[in-house]
């Protein structure tokens, strides 16, 4: 509290605004990463506040994913800390099952985010040694500005906070429908239409597959090399198999084995216009964070001619698209499966821990979860949900050790006496 009074002395305007002192960390983001961190803090008896700009938890999953989506990895690699998936869930839970799991998770660990609070800025105040997090919350008729003052700030907005919209010559004048993959729900409304899917990652492949299954005519733009792996080999998860092999074999050998297995299951995909990178799939993931595509049926559709693979785009002209090889295609609709990016640079006023791309600078050193001055990041290590869970455990232990020492509380305490958040309004 001494720091709080020092902050008030040097900024008299605080008394004229709604200001909340948080007796614990502020977590920005109520997706899986933020929920995992909150749950681990709960187990450490550390109070917290979770700020979420949307009106629900896991808004990316609830509002910006397609209907057919399932987890790409087996559920044991996607569960959050302290709570496994229900035993009756399939190995690859559906979108709806994963959302149900997250909602149950939030209930179990008493996580009640402050919804519709969009963080405008967050900066560390050197004088007080505290973080100042300014938010704007909007209702139907009012707009409220709040400033949260805290000792610790956990950035949990993740790798996929904002859609990436490519700049393509003539796209703005295209006469058909253009949507980002985050607005795509089902191929049902595209039946019989010629749809150009821009992007060939997991989203691009699955959107193309879904379109083909709904009798659309998808063409998928593939500009660069990529690794496509079967999701399973002989009934076993390819990812799980890779993780087991890495315990015993060097990475280069694991990559060679995976490529042989992929060729055995999928055949030579390069003859369909899908060129593989020189770097192996696991090495590419480790070095550049580029995730291999896990095939769930798209390659078979490509082989049958149900999905057309095309090279890069040169320009749009009316309802036509000209490709870099000179070919022209008639197109009714365009789906931009061009990915997402971090939005951290837009609101976090800090450039020592985070780089301009919105990722921690120290990710490659396996220390991308902790910065200075009480700043933490969860879910930025490009290791999926399992990586976010590992970050969450480390962050909670780091903050919890300081909290327990300073408050001299026992590690465990009855749930009934646990205080989620101690706040004072000024």
From Swiss-Prot:
Give the enzyme's EC designation: 1.14.13.168
What processes does the entry annotate via GO biological process terms? Answer: auxin biosynthetic process; brassinosteroid mediated signaling pathway; regulation of auxin biosynthetic process; response to cytokinin; response to ethylene
Conditions for induction: Up-regulated by high temperature via activation by PIF4. Positively regulated by STY1 and during the day by REV1.
What is the tissue specificity? Expressed in root tips and in hydathodes. Expressed in root vasculature and quiescent center, but not in the meristematic zone of the root tip.
The protein's GO terms of the molecular function aspect are:
flavin adenine dinucleotide binding; indole-3-pyruvate monooxygenase activity; N,N-dimethylaniline monooxygenase activity; NADP binding
Q: Which SUPFAM superfamilies match?
A: FAD/NAD(P)-binding domain
The Swiss-Prot or TrEMBL record lists the needed cofactor(s) as: FAD
Name the positions where NADP(+) binds: 199-204
Q: Which UniProt keywords are present, listed alphabetically?
A: Auxin biosynthesis, FAD, Flavoprotein, Monooxygenase, NADP, Oxidoreductase
Q: Which reaction does it catalyse?
A: indole-3-pyruvate + NADPH + O2 + H(+) = (indol-3-yl)acetate + CO2 + NADP(+) + H2O
Which amino acid positions bind FAD, per UniProt?
29-34
Work out whether the entry's keyword set contains NADP. Answer: yes
Kindly indicate whether the keyword Coiled coil belongs to this entry. no
Q: Which cysteines share a disulfide bond?
A: none
| Role according to the record | Involved in auxin biosynthesis. Belongs to the set of redundant YUCCA genes probably responsible for auxin biosynthesis in roots.
Task: Identify the PANTHER family for this entry.
Answer: FLAVIN-BINDING MONOOXYGENASE-LIKE PROTEIN (AFU_ORTHOLOGUE AFUA_4G09220), INDOLE-3-PYRUVATE MONOOXYGENASE YUCCA8-RELATED
Name recorded for this polypeptide: Probable indole-3-pyruvate monooxygenase YUCCA8
What is the species of this protein? Arabidopsis thaliana (Mouse-ear cress)
